[in-house]
């Protein structure tokens, strides 16, 4: 049957889209509550004394300065014992996958003897991997991205990324590569991504997307940071080519990188920086060894500090989207076959009519009962009670006919618009009256057919 109004037969489902949703927000005012302080002996044999939180605070090596996290080193005293005092912070939380976004104003680096890093690793190294997002030694100019794994992971030497692959095998024991070198990608954006030039340009953002298939790392200088990087739902697909890419068919990331903590630290000398010292034309002239230079020159490391605006970790999920607004519907139902929906409505239709007489040969009903099956049959019998469709017993006996009918309603579903509330489209009163009138006509027709054919109860 047709109606001239719009009918609402169901609520519109809220749509959602797969995107990144914020899981952990590392801000300066809560930063030190979310990290643990590593204070054991450095595993890379660095000349460094890592302090616990209380001692680091007492020596003013940590804090919040200019609304940013400050992580510094001792730059006032000649080093003794295990080395120059510094800090190594690791997230209390362990991660598997995610989007890690860090906004950094200033980093250590560019000074002889320093070995700063922003990285992730697992307690089951190298089986569960290590990822270096920022790392360098001595007077290095460009940032190095690296992945360290067990055997069975190699990356393509060319691909959809901007960096330059130095070594392709991520295995820390790979033949033909330095021990623990892993797969190394050098940033080709010049010196803006590391050390003094990074600091002079007020830093930038490092964003790392880690999935089962691949790890991609972007570096954005301050003036090139995408608008959505610090939004509720950042979208890496809009950021262009990453600086580094680890993955592909020769490296199942889901197998090799798991259970990672995020780490910031500043070390001195150690395996990498020590090894580079003799061949460094500038550093090697300052002292015979890296350790001697770091020990005797505290003021050289005043600028060896991290200043971090924030770090955020996102995970993929489904974010709700609001239904779009639509113009007010027209006064009559338009022909929109792509939006058409049908609903089958079954109900018990009950009506009472007088028996056929000379004055009423068809026995047409005097008044229909409710059109809703929820109300049930109305009282019958000709007593004059409320709801009785028969007049008082001055006429012949009444007969009650009950028919069961199934109707199919065809309606046009329209999006919610300004005239709606909460996405629910109201049914115009004119449309409801249409339904009632049509239902009455159908009942009269049914009663006439029953009467002619002699069907009654």
From Swiss-Prot:
Residues 19-319 form the GH16 domain. Residues 353-362 have a biased composition (Polar residues). Residues 318-397 are annotated as: Disordered. Glycans are attached at residue 200. It comes from the Eukaryota. GO terms for molecular function: endo-1,3(4)-beta-glucanase activity. Residues 333-352, 368-378 have a biased composition (Low complexity). It is an enzyme of class 3 (hydrolase). Residues 1-18 form the signal peptide. It is found in: Secreted. Its EC number is 3.2.1.6. The active site is at residues 130, 135. InterPro entries: ConA-like_dom_sf (IPR013320), GH16 (IPR000757), Glycosyl_Hydrlase_16 (IPR050546). PANTHER family: GLYCOSIDASE C21B10.07-RELATED (PTHR10963:SF24), GLYCOSYL HYDROLASE-RELATED (PTHR10963). Mixed-linked glucanase involved in the degradation of complex natural cellulosic substrates. Active on laminarin. lichenan, soluble carboxymethyl cellulose but not on pustulan. Belongs to the glycosyl hydrolase 16 family. This is Endo-1,3(4)-beta-glucanase ARB_04519. It comes from Arthroderma benhamiae (strain ATCC MYA-4681 / CBS 112371) (Trichophyton mentagrophytes). The lineage of its organism: Eukaryota, Fungi, Dikarya, Ascomycota, Pezizomycotina.
């Amino acid at each position: 049957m047709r109606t001239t109004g719009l009918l609402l037969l169901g609520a519109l489902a809220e749509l959602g889209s797969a995107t990144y949703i914020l899981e952990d927000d590392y801000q300066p005012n809560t930063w030190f509550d979310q990290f643990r302080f590593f204070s054991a002996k450095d595993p890379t044999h660095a000349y460094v004394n890592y302090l616990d939180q209380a001692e680091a605070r007492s020596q003013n090596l940590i804090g919040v300065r200019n609304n940013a996290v400050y992580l510094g080193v001792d730059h006032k005293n000649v080093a003794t014992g295990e080395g120059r005092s510094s800090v190594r912070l690791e997230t209390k939380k362990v991660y598997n996958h995610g989007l890690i976004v860090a906004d950094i104003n200033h980093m250590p680096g560019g000074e002889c003897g320093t070995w700063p890093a922003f990285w992730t690793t697992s307690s089951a190294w190298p089986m569960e991997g290590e990822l270096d997002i920022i790392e360098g030694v001595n007077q290095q100019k460009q940032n190095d991205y690296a992945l360290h794994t067990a055997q069975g992971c190699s990356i393509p030497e060319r691909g959809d990324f901007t960096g330059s692959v130095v070594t392709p095998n991520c295995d820390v024991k790979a033949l033909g590569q330095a021990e623990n070198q892993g797969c190394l990608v050098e940033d080709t954006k010049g010196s803006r991504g590391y050390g003094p030039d990074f600091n002079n340009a007020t830093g930038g953002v490092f964003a790392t997307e880690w999935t089962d298939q691949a790890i991609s790392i972007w570096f954005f200088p301050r003036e090139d940071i995408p608008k959505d990087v610090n939004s509720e739902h950042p979208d890496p697909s809009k950021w262009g080519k990453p600086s580094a890419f680890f993955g592909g068919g020769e490296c199942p990331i889901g197998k090799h990188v798991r259970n990672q903590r995020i780490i910031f630290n500043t070390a001195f000398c150690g395996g990498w920086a020590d090894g580079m010292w003799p061949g460094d034309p500038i550093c090697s002239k300052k002292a015979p060894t890296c350790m001697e230079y770091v020990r005797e020159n505290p003021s050289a490391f005043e600028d060896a500090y991290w200043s971090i605006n924030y770090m955020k970790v996102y995970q993929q999920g489904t974010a709700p989207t609001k239904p779009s607004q639509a113009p007010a519907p027209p006064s009559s139902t338009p022909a929109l076959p792509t939006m058409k929906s049908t609903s089958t409505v079954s109900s018990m239709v009950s009506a009472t009519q007088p028996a056929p007489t000379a004055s009423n040969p068809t026995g047409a009903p005097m008044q229909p009962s409710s059109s809703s099956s929820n109300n049930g049959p109305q009282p019958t019998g000709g007593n004059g009670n409320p709801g009785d469709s028969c007049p008082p017993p001055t006429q012949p006996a009444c007969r009650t006919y009950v028919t069961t009918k199934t109707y199919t309603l065809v309606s046009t579903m329209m999006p919610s618009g300004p005239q709606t509330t909460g996405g629910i489209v109201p049914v115009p009163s004119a449309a409801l009256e249409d339904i009632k009138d049509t239902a009455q006509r159908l009942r009269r027709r049914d009663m006439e057919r029953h009467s002619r054919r002699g069907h009654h109860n």
